[in-house]
């Protein structure tokens, strides 16, 4: 099978709050904004924010789907998660630094950064 995964969406209760959170986190403006579904396009991948309650859907928040964002360095990772509620602290796992935070809407999001050879990063 030849396939490609091109998008994922997170359920949000408050679109304005969620858009502000992710604009700050990604350091870029939302690509498409709507009261029900807003989109960030990052490296060709579409991350959607879905205001599920506006269309009468139900949803359970938590860690059943874990988007993972890769950044270039542990310094960037630390800067991006500073002040956020961590549900998994910064930890070295094999060749990566990994942390997981809870976003403004209750979703869990992982952030990873590569460990540099001889970098003494801790």
What are the roles of these predicted feature ranges?
Residues 1-19, 46, 65-67, 115-122:
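N-terminal beta-strand motif that seeds the catalytic metal site of vicinal oxygen chelate
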Residues 3, 35, 94-96:
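Loop/turn position at the start of each blade in beta-propeller repeats
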Residues 4-13, 41, 58-122:
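Vicinal oxygen chelate
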Residues 9-47:
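Core segments of cupin and vicinal oxygen chelate
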Residues 32-34, 63, 93:
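Residues that act as N-cap/strand-start positions at coil-to-secondary-structure junctions
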Residues 47-49, 111:
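Generic preference for hydrophobic
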Residues 54-56:
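Short, surface-exposed beta-strand-loop junctions and turns on beta-sheet-rich folds
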């Amino acid at each position: 099978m030849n396939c490609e995964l091109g998008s994922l969406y997170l359920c949000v209760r408050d679109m304005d709050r969620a858009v502000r959170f992710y604009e700050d986190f990604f350091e870029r403006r939302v690509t498409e904004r709507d009261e029900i579904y807003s989109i960030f396009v990052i490296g060709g991948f579409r991350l959607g924010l879905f205001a599920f309650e506006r269309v009468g859907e139900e949803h359970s928040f938590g860690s059943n789907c874990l988007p993972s964002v890769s950044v270039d360095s542990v310094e960037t990772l630390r800067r991006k998660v500073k002040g956020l509620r961590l549900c998994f602290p910064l930890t070295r796992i094999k060749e990566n630094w990994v942390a997981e935070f809870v976003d403004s809407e209750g979703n869990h999001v992982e952030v990873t950064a590569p460990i540099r050879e001889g970098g003494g990063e801790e």
